[in-house]
A protein has these predicted regions:
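Hydrophobic helical membrane-anchoring modules
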Residues: 2, 9-21, 199-326
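Structured catalytic core of nucleotide-sugar glycosyltransferases
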Residues: 9-147
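Solvent-exposed polar/charged
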Residues: 78, 103, 129, 133, ...
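Structural signal for short hydrophobic segments within the conserved structured cores
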Residues: 84-86, 169, 209
Length: 326
């Protein structure tokens, strides 16, 4: 007897595959003015992501803002309860805030978006398309920026130095807007303290897909990234990724030692021949002052490297979470 074969399709064949999840980490620091507009744009982005079979996870990290940023974040959560809010106990800096946000990522792909609206949220859609196409790492490089001339100059110098000393091939316009596969998450979460997230992600490799965009003009508030913070950021980046300064010091020391040996030999021979005249006190004093200052500068450079080692091994947390609203 032949058994009856059911003509109805199997239950599994009609089941839809669940959407993938895209997580966006948004560090917030004195961004009360831009948050309503940012959320409005992200709502549009979320709808367009769903058309790509992607759900959106929003993770806002309030980095000790002294304005009404936290209140604005609560308004966003009221409208969209799935939004995650991480409130830090004080200001720890954008790197620490970003890495704290990474700890709450649950998506298949994750990225970083500035809260000041200078980076267009719609750029996330194009990056998502490249991730769907198979790229694990997608970055959006600034081709131009509508910032004050001093800010543009300092940024240009910064990225030139980074490309020369730290990471040859690093995009000249720099980038903060990026999308990464979840396979990269563990590397970033476990990176050492004060590590430049964008540069470290680039250093990891993964053959990034590079997109381009024009950075918007700031419409709300003012930049809190002061000259002092820019300098500290540069020092942390160089000392965290490159041994070039120490090697330059070593090469310079060898050159000075060789020249000193030659000059010392000349003095000894001149003295033995009776042709030695003590002159040039002003020149000698200037040289001593110059090399003393240079030695102190080199000690400072070594101190920066030693400080990074100390910061990496001590038990002080990179950031302290005060409250979470998940």
């Amino acid at each position: 007897m032949v058994g009856r074969v059911s003509a109805s399709p199997s239950r599994n064949s009609t089941r839809h595959m669940p959407n993938k999840l895209l997580s966006l980490v948004v560090p917030v620091y004195f961004n009360a003015g831009s948050l309503p507009g940012l959320f409005a744009e992200l709502e549009v982005v979320e709808q367009q992501l769903r058309a790509r079979a992607l759900d959106l996870e929003l993770i806002f990290v309030n980095d000790g803002s002294g304005d009404e940023s936290l209140r604005e974040l609560f308004k966003i959560k009221t409208k969209r309860p799935a939004t995650k809010i991480i409130n830090l106990s004080r200001n720890f800096g954008v790197i620490a805030a970003t890495k704290t946000g990474f700890r709450f990522v649950t998506g298949d792909v994750f990225g970083i978006l500035a809260a000041d609206l200078q980076d267009p949220p719609q750029q996330v859609l194009e990056m998502a398309d490249h991730w769907i196409a198979g790229h694990k790492f997608v970055i959006s490089v600034r081709t131009a920026r509508e910032d004050p001339w001093l800010s543009r100059l300092l940024s240009r110098l910064y990225y030139r130095v980074i490309g020369w000393i730290v990471a040859p091939g690093y995009p000249a316009g720099g980038y903060d807007l990026m999308l990464m596969d979840k396979s990269m998450l563990g590397h970033l979460v476990n990176s050492t303290k004060h590590t430049n997230v964008a540069l470290y992600a680039f250093w990891l490799g993964f053959n990034p897909a590079i997109l381009y965009y024009v950075r918007r003009k700031r419409q709300h508030g003012k930049s809190r990234f002061t000259l002092g913070k820019r300098l500290k950021f540069l020092i942390d980046t160089i000392s965290g990724f490159s041994a070039t300064p120490i090697r330059m010091m070593s090469v310079f020391g060898i050159i000075v030692a060789i020249l000193s040996f030659i000059y010392g030999t000349h003095i000894v021979i001149s003295a033995l021949l009776g042709d030695f005249d003590i002159r040039g006190f002003a020149t000698l004093a200037a040289l001593i002052s110059f090399f003393s200052g240079l030695i102190l500068f080199m000690l400072g450079v070594l101190g920066e490297y030693l400080w990074r080692v100390f910061a990496a091994v001590n038990n002080v947390p990179e950031a302290v979470v005060d409250e979470t609203f998940l």
